[in-house]
Swiss-Prot record:
This is Methylthioribose-1-phosphate isomerase. The gene is MRI1. Its main location: cytoplasm. InterPro entries: IF-2B-related, IF-M1Pi, IF_2B-like_C, Initiation_fac_2B_a/b/d, M1Pi_N, NagB/RpiA_transferase-like. It comes from Lodderomyces elongisporus (strain ATCC 11503 / CBS 2605 / JCM 1781 / NBRC 1676 / NRRL YB-4239). One of its GO terms (molecular function) is S-methyl-5-thioribose-1-phosphate isomerase activity.
Amino acid sequence: MSKESRTLQAIKFDRQNVTLDILDQLVLPYSTTYISIKSIDDAYNAIKSMQVRGAPAIAIVGAFAIVVDIYNNLKSKDGNSSIGDLQTSLQHLLRSRPTAVNLANAINDIEQILCSYETSEVLNESIYKQIFDYATRLYDDDLANNHKIGENGLKYIVESLKQENFKGPFSIITICNTGSLATSGHGTALGIIRSTYAKLHKEVSGEDFFLDHVYPCETRPYNQGAKLTTYELDYEKIPFTLICDNMVSSLIQTLKNEKKDVHGKTSPVKFIIVGADRIVRNGDAANKIGTFQLATIAQYFNSAQDTKIKFIVAAPRTTIDLNTETGDEIKIEERPHKELTTLVGPVLNGLEVGDKITVGIATPGITVWNPAFDVTPHGLIDSIITEDPIAYVKDKNGNYNLT
């Protein structure tokens, strides 16, 4: 794919013509293809298959799909769906990805709109307009909040480095994809990296330190880091080096050794910044599988060696679930075993991109455990960054107050 054809716009909603198209993230980074979403069922399939992913984006696509579904029903000669029919469809949509709370929150909000009507009542323009206004506001708020998250994360990074009296270049590790492709735009964890690089890269930083390099984890087994985060970093021209998930400890150890380097880079890792699909009342955070081990690695280096690495979780307030007390109560989605036993991608011949094929990489017929998420205990999290102006940090007793 030529660089001119690339885009970071994951969601296209035409407010005038009421159409929804999403960027098919299963074919990135080799192809830019948009898929038309014309119904709630289309959205369910796209979310379930991970053609769209990222907790905020899932909620936005779900909400817009509901709008499109109602609109098409009202315009159809045979359109006579009831409130009860819509409520049944909403519960079906909710089952597409159970771990991320944003979709559940959006569906609950829409359910509240429907509570004013009888279940037997036929869908009408008033219901449509209320849900249309809700969905567009959800998108607009998410985009504005992502920029706030970026600025708040930048502020926290600057304050942390100043408190430590750190000077010189530093690096950041991230996992999965938490950028424009996972949200309405800019991103959460990757949004912080964007904002930080814009203000703190070597040529513009007015501080005694600067962001030198980013290390995105490959993010097995679905490889969102390799496919999507590298796509965004390359698009934004932010310097990065891709690593496997199991290289993190070695990377940190190498970069803290003044006599060693990684392809000429020596800037130490000072921050690990991740997103979240659900943050519960006590601060436990569910995120892409592999996040928990990053926090554990950071804790080891912080406690066993003379290293200070801040572990930051970045997410909008819509990701915070105050109705769930601890991470033990979070339902963790388990993905199909084939995602672990096969690799899917196009055949590459030089610069030519061929047909997509599936390649086996494991012994046939074996048992596989493939949880999509893990839960990082709040005790391992240094800060939770949201659109709220002040970063959430633990009190003297090691507890978060997210209310």
